[in-house]
Amino acid sequence: MSALAFRERPPAAEPRGLLILHHGRGTDERDLLPLADVHDPQRELQVVSPRGPLQRPGWPGYHWYAVPRVGYPDPETFAATYSALSEFHDELWERTRLGPEQTVLGGFSMGTVMSYALGLGRDRPAPAGILAFSGFVPTVDDWVPELQSRTATHVFIAHGRNDPIIGVEFGRRARALLEGELDVEYHETDAAHYVDPAYLPAALHWLERAAPDPSGGDG
């Protein structure tokens, strides 16, 4: 059984898919759950938000890995969290009977990094979508993105041009890396390091398209 704590927002009826939200640095599993009702107002998705496994000296909340340099996670803590999240996702798919092809991995900041890592890792199954707010595709030892087998994966990237924490160039690099192989939708606003409400209507529309419809439609 995975050791990661989590919170869950159940669907109103039989879910059409699964949305896993990974919080940012220094918060916890409660932080992104309010986005569930924004992105899925009809409560058609099972929504789960795990808690990062690390606490860092001098920081509040929880973290996914140590940060020696933006863009380059600490290899040791990254690898441990990658393994823990892999186990968490696998157990969640077994419990909910919703597979990776019905799953959107989402996150903010450090949580986006882990969504990219688990969604693009060569030893992990391809998800239906990746919802990426203000993050980056990591550069880290022993991890490389595998793109050619993920051409059906939808990616939504949103990044603020005035982000002082993770500069907008990281969002642009992710777009450049992914758009040749995956279905990428990209947005920028003048926001700093937060989820700009201006992104949300487009994200809602994207999620309806990315999350599969059990009736056989496009979702």
Locate each region found by the language model.
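Short alpha-helix in the alpha/beta-hydrolase fold that links the catalytic acid
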Residues: 32-35, 143-144, 167-177
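Short beta-strand immediately N-terminal to the catalytic nucleophile in serine-hydrolase-like folds
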Residues: 105-107, 133
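Gly/Ala-rich beta-loop-alpha elbow adjacent to hydrolase catalytic centers
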Residues: 107-111, 115
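A conserved short beta-strand
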Residues: 125-137
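Short beta-strand/loop motif that positions the catalytic acidic residue
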Residues: 157-159, 163
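C-terminal catalytic histidine-bearing segment of alpha/beta-hydrolase fold enzymes
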Residues: 168-219
